Amino acid sequence: MQSRLIVDAQKESLLSTHKVLRNTYFLLGLTMAFSAVVAFISMSLNLPYPNIIVLLVGFYGLLFLTNKLADRPAGILAAFAFTGFMGYTIGPILNMYVARGMEDLIMLAFAGTAIVFFACSAYVLTTKKDMSFLSSAMFALFIVLLLGMVASFFFQIPALSVAISALFVVFSTMTILYETSNIIHGGETNYIRATVNIYVSIYNLFLSLLRLLSIFSSDE
């Protein structure tokens, strides 16, 4: 009787995990598509890049709102608002690369981002390896990135820019591995939070790859 209860509990846990994972990927696909549409509109209208205050308030404000409402249906709307805002911010950046004749680099960065995301997801889903051991390294890397970004405001050093972009690629890749593992092992049970976390990682990964490609393809 006890063994049957254990088996039933395991099945229920597995079904719950699969549901969170399925909902996460579904919402991620929708928000990515919405973000791409907003980015296209932003590019078409040639909208300016937001100033630092609007950027910080928009990013952290909408991120906080999404996490606050993650347990309610309104959290889905907040997630779309957040990813839509991020799509708007990426439009002016892409226009800058298009103006410099670097459309091919945008496609390469997009392809590279897709490959990294699907490879990381496939690895975790296939091996079902627990990636929680990455948390300490991710925290340390986050501190390094924070210090590096602060330093970049005062010192315009090309090598520093390369290092920050490269570390962001590593950090984003680790985050995708960690978040996917966290879902399948029951550490994350809210698909809205999981979606936003993975979205931010993909966003940073894409921009970092694009920056690296532009640096190595130019005379900087």
UniProtKB/Swiss-Prot annotation:
Main subcellular location of this protein, as a coarse class: membrane
Q: What is a single molecular function from GO for this protein? A: calcium channel activity
Q: Which InterPro entries match?
A: Bax_inhbtr1_CS (IPR006213), Bax_inhibitor_1-related (IPR006214)
Question: Which BP terms from GO are recorded?
Answer: negative regulation of apoptotic process; regulation of proteolysis
Record's bilayer topology term = Multi-pass membrane protein
On whether Membrane is a keyword of this UniProt record, the answer is yes
Q: Which residues cross the membrane?
A: 24-44, 45-65, 74-94, 105-125, 137-157, 158-178, 196-216
In which compartments does the protein localize? Cell membrane
PROSITE patterns with a match to the protein in the record: BI1
Q: Kindly state which keywords UniProt assigns to this record, in alphabetical order.
A: Cell membrane, Membrane, Transmembrane, Transmembrane helix
What's in the GO CC field?
plasma membrane
Family membership, please give it. Belongs to the BI1 family.
- Protein name (Swiss-Prot/TrEMBL): Uncharacterized protein HI_0044
Q: What species does this protein belong to?
A: Haemophilus influenzae (strain ATCC 51907 / DSM 11121 / KW20 / Rd)
What is the taxonomic lineage of the source species?
Bacteria, Pseudomonadati, Pseudomonadota, Gammaproteobacteria, Pasteurellales
